Regions:
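Substrate-positioning beta->alpha
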Residues: 169-176, 189-213, 220
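Conserved Rossmann-fold NAD(P)-dependent oxidoreductase catalytic core, especially the SDR/UDP-sugar
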Residues: 26, 81, 88-135
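Conserved beta-loop-beta element that borders a ligand/cofactor-binding pocket
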Residues: 143-167
Length: 303
């Protein structure tokens, strides 16, 4: 099928595009810069120039495609402290894409995050695909997409863990944590660091997007999760080894100062299961886990 992909030259997109092409699909990738356009063309995709603010352009591209994968997000706004603006832009873009697909039965695969499960108040057990919150940042877009199943769209949402890792990752949370460790001289965790974060390799996540596009039933929540939950102190220890800095506990009161915009997230306990997704899509993670990938060294050679 012909697939329109936003964020096609980004971290996840740079794995999703080859995954789609290798499976025999045609890809039209959204590019907002000359560099992004060149990268997409080199990968074998058709290029459509534009950005998330061009809502009419998004509608036109979605209408012309057989399916849509929405990966783009204004991460720069989030890093600059304008998270609400990034959330609003994502919801507007999602609604624009959806408006072109209603009543067609075409697939729309969009993106959310497992950290948003904290809005559902889940504690003491791994979050599952059946769990959801009534509202909140990114949750509103997620619930909107699930609701499209009743409006003639084969919609699904992929929840990514807070760390999606590989050599394709140049700006994700792993890089941020490494940068903080080097800047402060300490690889930190909050309190006793027993809270858990899930993770997935980029190439494994890309397969979830492709399989979701091809086969997920309308209204599916999918978990692209390989490591169900790694103690944050273990993540900090791996970063400490790679960066050559000591590992230390940071008090909850000092977390915002030490971890900057990540201060509100690093102490969250977010174990997440992908059992339902694996059975539904026939997907099995096949690439290295987070600690192995950090110990490989490429993050520290490039950071």
């Amino acid at each position: 099928m012909s697939v329109f992909v936003t964020g096609a030259s980004g971290h996840i997109g740079s794995a999703v595009v080859p995954e789609l092409l290798q499976a025999g699909h045609q890809v039209v990738g959204l590019a907002r810069s000359d560099a992004a356009a060149a990268a997409l063309a080199a990968a074998g995709a058709e290029v459509r120039r534009g950005d998330l603010d061009d809502l009419e352009g998004l509608r036109e591209a979605a209408a012309a495609a057989d399916g849509v994968i929405h990966l783009a997000f204004k991460h720069d706004l989030m890093r600059d402290g304008a998270f609400p603006d990034a959330i609003a832009a994502d919801l507007a873009a999602t609604q624009a894409l959806a408006s072109a697909l209603e009543g067609t039965g075409k697939p729309l695969v969009t993106t959310s995050g497992t950290l948003m499960l904290t809005f559902a108040g889940i504690t003491g057990r791994p979050g599952t695909e059946a769990d959801f919150a009534p509202g909140g940042p990114r949750v509103d877009a997620e619930n909107f997409v699930i609701g499209l199943a009743d409006r003639g769209v084969r919609s699904s949402i992929v929840r990514l863990p807070p760390i999606t890792h590989s050599s394709l990752d140049h700006h994700g949370f792993a890089h941020v944590l490494i940068g903080i460790a080097r800047q402060t001289g300490v690889s930190g965790y909050v309190a006793d660091g027993a809270n858990r974060w899930p993770s997935v390799h980029t190439l494994d996540a890309a397969r979830v997007y492709r399989l979701g596009l091809e086969a997920a039933p309308a209204g599916s929540r999918l978990h692209a999760v390989a490591d169900e939950g790694i103690r944050f102190r273990e993540i900090a220890a791996a970063i400490g080894r790679g960066a050559g800095v000591p590992v230390a506990s940071i008090s909850a009161a000092d977390a915002a100062t030490h971890f900057s915009f990540l201060g509100g997230f690093v102490g969250i306990d977010n174990p997440v299961s992908s059992e339902v997704t694996q059975k539904l899509l026939g997907w099995t993670p096949a690439h290295p886990g987070l600690i192995e990938d950090l110990d490989h060294g490429h993050y520290f050679a490039r950071n």
